[in-house]
Regions:
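Flavin-dependent oxidoreductase catalytic cores
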Residues: 1-177
Length: 177
């Protein structure tokens, strides 16, 4: 745990050195690993408890499913973000992500009150104007799948488009696959 905390300290010192209080510093982490010897929520929570003492603005939790429940360690059976938010609430903003595509997905995530911010990657790749579609509650206009026949619908660079068509867990779901 010493290394990530020293990296955060170094970033904060540089911000102070150049007198840039507006420079936002955060920490992104994956909360739990599925393998036997992987990181558990116990280790994650120890790190989170130290991070909230630092002058950072956010902690970003990266996971496949926003509502994923803890498998091992602290908080077993409870949503990871809920466990983490108990520690971060009022101290540092928490950003959550994971498998949010539809208007209903985003609404459910917001209503959970597990986080201050919601991030999205794949849904943004599928919808150039996702923020507007969500704000205007245009549920039926939100693309949930990548249409491989119509690349013009997206702002995806050619190399990334080729990867998207092949498919992968970390890419948007593709129609017909």
């Amino acid at each position: 745990m010493r290394f990530p905390l020293e990296v955060v300290d170094a970033c904060c010192k540089i911000r102070d050195k150049y007198n840039k209080p507006e420079f936002i510093i955060g920490y992104r982490l994956s909360p739990e690993e599925p393998f036997e010897n992987g990181i558990t929520m116990t280790e994650t929570m120890a790190l989170v408890r130290e991070l909230v003492k630092k002058p950072i603005q956010y902690i970003h939790i990266s996971q496949k499913n926003f509502f994923q429940k803890t498998r091992r360690g602290e908080g077993i059976g409870v949503e990871r973000l809920k466990v983490i938010h108990k520690e971060t609430r009022g101290k540092v903003a928490l950003i959550g992500v994971g498998g949010l595509y539809s208007y209903k997905d985003f609404t459910k995530a917001l209503k959970s009150e597990f986080v201050e911010f919601i991030g999205t990657g794949r849904a943004s790749m599928l919808n150039k104007d996702l923020g507007i579609l969500l704000k205007e509650q245009r549920e039926n206009d939100i693309n949930l799948l990548l249409d491989p026949v119509h690349p013009e619908l997206y702002s995806i660079p050619n190399m990334l488009w080729a990867l998207c068509i092949k498919g992968g867990d970390w890419l948007p779901p593709v129609k017909g696959k």
